[in-house]
Each structure stands twice: as C-alpha cells, then as structure tokens.
C-alpha cells in the first residue's frame, strides 16, 4: 500500500468504517485510491454504466459531467447503502478497520453474495484473520481474474488485519 494511502486511512479511523472505506476508495487526494474517478459516465469492464468513484445505477445521467461534490455525495450514499445491506448479517463485534475494508470490498463487488459467503461465516465464527484472508478470493470480474482487483484486495486485506495488531 502506498505510504500516503496508509497515512490517510490511519487518519480516517476516528471517523468510523464509512470514513475508512471512503479514503480507501478515493485516496488521499480524492483521485488516487482503489477506485479511479471519472466525472463522465463510462461502461466498466463488464459493461455496466459507471461514474465518479465507481457509482452504478439507474440514476446515472449519460452525457452529464458530474462535479467533485456530486461524486462525494454519491459515494457517501452508496457506502451508507452497503452498510445497511451487510451490517445486519455481522453478528459479532469487529474492528472498524475491518468493517471499512468490507465496505470497500462490497462497494466494489456488490453485497449480494456476501450473505452466503465463507467470508461472512468466518467473521461470525470470530476468525478475523481467516475472514481477512478471504478477501483474496474476490478478484474476478466477468469470469476473469484481474491484476487490479488482486492489488486492491491485498490493500483491503492489510486494512482488514489492522484490528489484529
């Protein structure tokens, strides 16, 4: 993980899991995190219309140029949605750094498969390291493994494990 990202994530810990995930996604300067930024909608590697830091959905307006403030608002809304989708399934106390890493992961891949995942099962069994190691399995898009996703998952795993230290 780049030292600047490590420092920014450490500074965000007091803000909670959503703040941690936001810094992971946007990076210290707002465009150098795990997600790139595009103010103009584009199709991602699996053909989904995407804008800003990875926002997807029917509310994307093709042809519109989004502002930095609009992108921040979309990210905050999306991370709050991720939190609502997964928090009810986590039955044990986990560190905020782990929760932030999970929010980042599920912002990227969607929360659908989380409910039946080995990742969640390991969390609820109290196997924090085993759960964090599961992040390495979420590296496929469109049936293909991607180096960029492998790198991202290693960074998320590192943050996930911070609560162990």
UniProtKB/Swiss-Prot annotation:
CDD domains: endolysin_R21-like. GO terms for molecular function: lysozyme activity. The active site is at 35 (proton donor/acceptor), 44 (proton donor/acceptor). The chain crosses the membrane at residues 8-28. It is found in: Host cell inner membrane. It catalyses: Hydrolysis of (1->4)-beta-linkages between N-acetylmuramic acid and N-acetyl-D-glucosamine residues in a peptidoglycan and between N-acetyl-D-glucosamine residues in chitodextrins. This is SAR-endolysin. Belongs to the glycosyl hydrolase 24 family. Signal-arrest-release (SAR) endolysin with lysozyme activity that degrades host peptidoglycans and participates with the pinholin and spanin proteins in the sequential events which lead to programmed host cell lysis releasing the mature viral particles. Once the pinholin has permeabilized the host cell membrane, the SAR-endolysin is released into the periplasm where it breaks down the peptidoglycan layer. GO terms for cellular component: host cell plasma membrane; membrane. The gene is R. Pfam families: Phage_lysozyme (PF00959). SUPFAM superfamilies: Lysozyme-like. Its EC number is 3.2.1.17.
């Amino acid at each position: 993980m780049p030292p600047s990202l490590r420092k920014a994530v450490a500074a965000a810990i007091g803000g909670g899991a959503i703040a941690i995930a936001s810094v992971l996604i946007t990076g210290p300067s707002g465009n150098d995190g795990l997600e790139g930024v595009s103010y103009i909608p584009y199709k991602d590697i699996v053909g989904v219309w995407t804008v800003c830091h990875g926002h997807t959905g029917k509310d994307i307006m093709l042809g519109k140029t989004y502002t930095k403030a609009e992108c921040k608002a979309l990210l905050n809304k999306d991370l709050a949605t991720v939190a609502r989708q997964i928090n009810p399934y986590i039955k044990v106390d986990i560190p905020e750094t782990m929760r932030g890493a999970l929010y980042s992961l599920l912002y990227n891949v969607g929360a659908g498969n989380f409910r039946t995942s080995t990742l969640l099962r390991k969390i609820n069994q109290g196997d924090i390291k085993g759960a964090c190691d599961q992040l390495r399995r979420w590296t496929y898009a469109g049936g293909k493994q991607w180096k960029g996703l492998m790198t991202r998952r290693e960074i998320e795993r590192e943050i996930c494990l911070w609560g162990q230290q």
